[in-house]
Amino acid sequence: MARKGLIQREKKRQKLEQKYHLIRRSSKKEISKVQSLNDKWEIYRKLQSPPRNSAPTRLHRRCFATGRPRANYRDFGLSGHILREMVHACLLPGARRSSW
């Protein structure tokens, strides 16, 4: 189980990313439209004004059940460890166990 503080930090980053998403997107569109280098630099400065944690690259997928940051399956939102346990317990419809 991940520490509670790390999970809360990730939730805070998600909220910040949603809050500043439109500002970042509009600034990036402006950069592609503007031709002059000085205007581009002004827009780049404007793009750097939101907090760092609002950047989408700072987000990290975590397991829905445990908060584990590694080995996550996007389709389920679970880490491989928990996914395997749930499949063996028949809690995920449509998932098949592998046996070899």
UniProtKB/Swiss-Prot annotation:
Its primary localisation, in coarse terms, equals plastid
SUPFAM superfamilies this protein is in?
A: Glucocorticoid receptor-like (DNA-binding domain) (SSF57716)
User: Which keywords, in A-to-Z order, does the entry hold?
Assistant: Chloroplast, Plastid, Ribonucleoprotein, Ribosomal protein, RNA-binding, rRNA-binding
| UniProt feature coiled coil, ranges | none
Pfam annotation, one family? Ribosomal_S14
Keyword Ribonucleoprotein among record annotations: yes
**Subunit notes for this chain?**
Part of the 30S ribosomal subunit.
Q: Name one GO molecular function term.
A: rRNA binding
Q: Where in the cell is it found?
A: Plastid, Chloroplast
* GO BP terms in the entry: translation
The protein depicted here goes by the name Small ribosomal subunit protein uS14c
What is known about what this protein does? Binds 16S rRNA, required for the assembly of 30S particles.
Q: Which GO terms describe its cellular component?
A: chloroplast; small ribosomal subunit
Q: Which family does it belong to?
A: Belongs to the universal ribosomal protein uS14 family.
Q: Which domain of life is it from?
A: Eukaryota
